[in-house]
Amino acid sequence: VERYSKNALTQGRNLLTLEICKKMIRQFLQYDARRAAQGTLILKGVETKLDFEMQHPTLKLPMKFTGVVDRLEVYDNAFIIWDYKSGAIGQSDLSLSGLGDLWKGSKGKPLQILLYAWLLWKKELVTHPFPWHSGMFKLQSGQPEHLLRGAALGKSNDITEALLFDFEQALCDYLSEVPSN
């Protein structure tokens, strides 16, 4: 901040960006305050760094997976993995008919959440029992609680240990098929 003029945040595009950021933060804090007033909210982690190393079961190559989860919480005794999004989230973005959809390039949001859940599970960082839940918070509009859904998650739309076993198998299968050049 010291390198920029004092007017940098009081006019033009920077002022507009600052005001939009303030609005997003205000909406998020209001949402959080409402949830805390309505139920039991226990924050378990913010910007939690995850990493896991393993050897590919058939290729016998080392693999390292990393990620940063925006927020982990327990709300009314349900463990929730949150991801904050500054852009648009459509219902179809979060619908997953099968784990094979993850590798087609159009299901980045479900892939991200399932990878985070898998990393938490593999590292045994969560003591809360399954099922777990996922959430995405649209910062631009203040619209929360977009959950992963679809046949891949079953009727409950929950993240289960069985789903994470299947995810790991699908991930390893996909990585076996990726060309090495």
Task: State what each model feature region is.
Residues 14, 18-22, 39, 62-65, ...:
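Active-site-proximal structural scaffolding
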Residues 7-8, 75, 91, 146:
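Hydrophobic, well-ordered secondary-structure segments
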Residues 34-40, 74-78, 122-129:
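Secondary-structure transition/capping motifs at alpha-helix termini
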Residues 1-55, 148-163, 175:
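A non-catalytic, helix-rich entry segment at domain boundaries
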Residues 45-123:
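Non-catalytic protein-protein interaction segments used by genome-maintenance enzymes to assemble
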